[in-house]
Amino acid sequence: MRIILLGAPGVGKGTQSNYISKTFGIPQISTGDMLRSAVKAGTPLGVAAKKVMDSGQLVSDEIIIALVKERLTKSDCSNGCLFDGFPRTLTQAEALRKDGIHIDYIVEIDVEDKEIIERMSGRRVHLASGRTYHVSFNPPKTVDIDDETGEPLTQREDDREETVKKRLEIYHAQTEPLIAYYLDLSHNGDLDAPTYFKIEGKGKVEDIRDRILEALMV
């Protein structure tokens, strides 16, 4: 079972990835992790990737796909895997298909942008302890003050509203063509097309988990 998990920043992909991975006994595959591992090990692909990164350029799709193919030969992928943050682009999706890497399911966790912005921009954190609050859902007793120490809370740069909006713009620009590509394969009756599930991402974490697992177990 090979699964691609899609969803904008802030929809809870990390949490749901863990549930899927544990339920089906398949590893999460992250291109970032693969790159770091290959560079650290000094493999031919790692050396090539490091050269590109050191020059300030983006690692090519060719190198990324080669890393994915290499990762899939590992024994822990014998029953499948969960792709985390990959493919990101239409070019990568087409390259997967061209190289015969079959995908069984695509799960999109769907949350409206307005909800995501509220979730992320409302976060506040106590940096020293890591304690996290939310101005609406889990507010501190005193505005912007840590309950235990009385020290000020901080809003991370990534959680600022303008930053969240920009990240969402990038996500939609990259992912909407990807979604259209896979849906077209399915609608055209392609026998190799993955099954596509769009999962409502609002509600309790456990409810979202149950929706995803129910879809994948049908």
UniProtKB/Swiss-Prot annotation:
Positions annotated to bind AMP: 31, 36, 57-59, 85-88, 92, 156, 167
Pathway given in the UniProt record: Purine metabolism; AMP biosynthesis via salvage pathway; AMP from ADP: step 1/1
Family matches, as InterPro entries: Adenyl_kin_sub, Adenylat/UMP-CMP_kin, Adenylat_kinase_CS, Adenylate_kinase_lid-dom, P-loop_NTPase
Stored Gene3D superfamilies: P-loop containing nucleotide triphosphate hydrolases (3.40.50.300)
Quaternary structure and interacting proteins, as annotated: Monomer.
Catalytic activity: AMP + ATP = 2 ADP
GN (gene name): adk
One example GO MF annotation: adenylate kinase activity
Protein family per UniProt: Belongs to the adenylate kinase family.
Entry's EC annotation: 2.7.4.3
Protein name as it appears in the record: Adenylate kinase
GO biological process, one term: AMP salvage
Free-text function comment from the UniProt entry: Catalyzes the reversible transfer of the terminal phosphate group between ATP and AMP. Plays an important role in cellular energy homeostasis and in adenine nucleotide metabolism.
Annotated positions binding ATP: 10-15, 123, 132-133, 203
Subcellular location: Cytoplasm
Free-text domain note: Consists of three domains, a large central CORE domain and two small peripheral domains, NMPbind and LID, which undergo movements during catalysis. The LID domain closes over the site of phosphoryl transfer upon ATP binding. Assembling and dissambling the active center during each catalytic cycle provides an effective means to prevent ATP hydrolysis.
Region called LID, residue ranges: 122-159
Entry GO terms, CC: cytoplasm
Region entry Disordered, spans: 141-161
Annotated spans, NMP: 30-59
Pfam families reported in the protein's UniProt record: ADK, ADK_lid
Keywords linked to the UniProt accession: ATP-binding, Cytoplasm, Kinase, Nucleotide biosynthesis, Nucleotide-binding, Transferase
Location, primary (coarse class): cytoplasm
